[in-house]
């Protein structure tokens, strides 16, 4: 059992028969009354997100999530296909369940498949990935890093804010946790 006050982003727990992943968690102390935990959560099975509050002392059953190394093969219609790199088993995951993760991976990328028991519940991408810029505004001569930046579309369709000196065709390092530009590759 884990208390609501100990829940952090990325953790998974069970509540009311649902498997829930914490997207955001914060303590909130209203002017009067006791502290509450405000959370943004995702139902792992349905993919729906919702906001809720819990008392800090409420307890939940922490879900045991196992991961296996896998490779992203391809996407067809509404299904993404992955292969376990140890056993060569293939997994089909609805695109709706991994839509955010697909913005960070290309075909043949290494990932980790997450299991709850025997049920595939998601994909874990590396903390940083290397992607190529496919579309952005032209560079401005003399641009520096201190500027406000400009939007750039990457090869997966992800749009990130980048410094003004970035050009089409350059490879960038992207932080997958925040969806932000880190550096040129």
Curated annotation (Swiss-Prot):
It is found in: Cytoplasm. GO terms for biological process: peptide biosynthetic process. GO terms for cellular component: cytoplasm. Keywords: Cytoplasm, Elongation factor, Protein biosynthesis. Disulfide bonds: none annotated. It comes from the Bacteria. Its main location: cytoplasm. SUPFAM superfamilies: Nucleic acid-binding proteins, Translation proteins SH3-like domain. One of its GO terms (molecular function) is translation elongation factor activity. Pathway: Protein biosynthesis; polypeptide chain elongation. InterPro entries: Elong-fact-P_C, NA-bd_OB-fold, Rib_uL2_dom2, Transl_elong_fac_P/YeiP, Transl_elong_KOW-like, Transl_elong_P/YeiP_cen, Transl_elong_P/YeiP_CS, Transl_elongation_fac_P. Involved in peptide bond synthesis. Stimulates efficient translation and peptide-bond synthesis on native or reconstituted 70S ribosomes in vitro. Probably functions indirectly by altering the affinity of the ribosome for aminoacyl-tRNA, thus increasing their reactivity as acceptors for peptidyl transferase. NCBIfam families: efp, PRK00529.1. HAMAP family: EF_P (MF_00141). Belongs to the elongation factor P family. This is Elongation factor P. It comes from Streptococcus equi subsp. zooepidemicus (strain MGCS10565).
